[in-house]
Amino acid sequence: MNILVTNDDGVTADGILCLARTLSKKYKVTVVAPETEQSAVGHAITLRLPLWLRKLDINENFEIYSVSGTPADCVKMGIDVVLGEKPDLLISGINRGNNLGTDVVYSGTVSGALEGAIAGVPSIAVSSYSFENPMYETAAKFILDFLEEFDVRSIPRFTALNINVPSVPYDQIKGWKLTRQSKRMYDDYFEKRVDPSGGNYYWMMGTIIEDDPDPKADYKAIAENYVSVTPISVFLTNEEYLKRLEERYEDKTIR
């Protein structure tokens, strides 16, 4: 199986190298990732600037390329320029820190996987829960084992798996659960600070809000030392609300 690997933490980040080294023991791996950190860039693509592609001279048993762009740029270039064909699987990660609830909207890691899904490639985003103490070896071993069990060819086009792995030793992982994207979000605020020259600047702060009653909420699996596996879609239409609107309103014609 040929696997294209990307991320948003940067091409030399510990998470992506750990994942690529682990996967390359069994699969053909090609890494195409941002040359600098692109965390929380969402699904941005580069339209008004050139993109630079460089092959890195690193002593690994896989090829590794940097792109002067976003994770979505990397996936596009990885498929069209580096490989010249679709890989069998795309994996984005391992992210430093979780991508749960509304994180998915902002995440470059998740967007890398969704870009693969748009291209018709079975795609997975994988994150290690703790930002302060990520355990990449646990997440990488889980993915290697997961690929033995899960038929990635069953993932429909325009769908990706968002996988979050508890940051604990592998022998403490209880298993994996199919979950839903939760309503986990942040209570954000901006702290006003003063720079050395006396000017004001702002730093975004916030606390996590976890009050989703759904027992299948993604973060609840993590709290019990289960890996959270959530199928997510490129499409954002609120089907339930659309149906209610259709029951109330007819199509309107402007005269």
UniProtKB/Swiss-Prot annotation:
Q: What does this protein do?
A: Nucleotidase that shows phosphatase activity on nucleoside 5'-monophosphates.
Q: What general EC class does the enzyme of this chain belong to?
A: hydrolase
Which metal ions or organic cofactors does this protein require, according to UniProt? a divalent metal cation
InterPro entries of this UniProt entry? SurE, SurE-like_Pase/nucleotidase, SurE-like_sf
Specify the superkingdom: Bacteria
- Source organism per entry reads Thermosipho africanus (strain TCF52B)
Q: How is the cofactor bound?
A: Binds 1 divalent metal cation per subunit.
**Catalytic reaction annotation:** a ribonucleoside 5'-phosphate + H2O = a ribonucleoside + phosphate
Q: Which gene encodes it?
A: surE
Where is this protein chiefly located?
cytoplasm
Q: What is this protein called?
A: 5'-nucleotidase SurE
Query: According to its UniProt record, where is this protein located?
Result: Cytoplasm
Q: Return the similarity comment.
A: Belongs to the SurE nucleotidase family.
| Keyword line | Cytoplasm, Hydrolase, Metal-binding, Nucleotide-binding
